[in-house]
Swiss-Prot record:
PROSITE patterns tied to this protein: TPR (PS50005), TPR_REGION (PS50293)
This protein's record includes keyword Repeat: yes
Swiss-Prot/TrEMBL TPR repeat ranges: 46-79, 81-113, 118-151
Keyword set includes Repeat: yes
Family statement drawn from the similarity comment of this UniProt entry: Belongs to the TTC36 family.
Organism for this UniProt entry: Nematostella vectensis (Starlet sea anemone)
SMART domains recorded: TPR
GO term, biological process aspect, one: tyrosine metabolic process
InterPro entries xref list: TPR-like_helical_dom_sf (IPR011990), TPR_rpt (IPR019734), TTC36 (IPR038906)
SUPFAM superfamilies membership: TPR-like (SSF48452)
Sorted UniProt keywords: Repeat, TPR repeat
Chain's gene name: ttc36
Record protein name field: Tetratricopeptide repeat protein 36 homolog
Source organism superkingdom: Eukaryota
Length: 181
């Protein structure tokens, strides 16, 4: 059962409360590389566990959600999405170290391709930013932006000092032209 665009928007808002609504580009959502040594039934079961995990997280049952994400990873350990979802849950629970480990694994397994990679790079960029490591955050946001994540694109601009200076100058110029300066 594929989630609708509205369902994906709601799930994205739940798992990424700091991200702007609707930032997940449609063209990368469905992309998933075939996974070697994993049969389609296992992938289907893993996706079902992930959906159950998201539903439990939405209901505030983080322990139940974690159990579902762990089952998804057990069933399809080479699938990046399970690690990415568990990382998002870990971040919500305040366990940034576990989140970082899962995001690193998601990036490795995704081969830097598709929605899982875009989300993992963006989430890892947020964790780096929380740690005060803006250089690493900028690199991850650039990767996420390249893969189509709109929030990562915005953060790439925000962390670029030249872009920030240009944005400030542009805002001042527009303010002067409109008489608000």
């Amino acid at each position: 059962m594929a989630a609708s665009v509205k369902d994906r928007a709601v799930l994205d808002a739940i798992f990424n409360p700091l991200l702007p609504l609707g930032d997940c580009p449609q063209e990368i959502i469905e992309e998933e590389l075939p996974i070697e040594n994993t049969n389609e039934d296992d992938v289907k079961r893993a996706k079902e566990y992930e959906i159950q995990g998201v539903e439990k997280a939405e209901a505030g049952d983080f322990v139940g959600a974690l159990d579902c994400f762990n089952k998804a990873i057990d069933v399809a350990p080479l699938r990046a999405s399970g690690y990415n979802n568990r990382a998002q849950l870990s971040r919500l629970r305040g366990d940034n170290q576990s989140a970082m480990e899962d995001l690193n694994k998601a990036i490795e397994l995704s081969h830097e391709h598709g929605a899982a990679a875009a989300q993992a790079y963006t989430q890892r960029g947020l964790l780096h930013r929380l740690e005060g490591n803006d250089e690493a955050a900028s690199e991850d946001f650039q990767h996420g932006a390249t893969l189509g994540n709109a929030f990562a694109k915005a953060m790439t601009v925000q962390l670029n000092p030249y872009a920030a200076m240009c944005n400030k100058m542009l805002a001042e110029a527009i303010g002067k032209l409109s008489g608000h300066a």
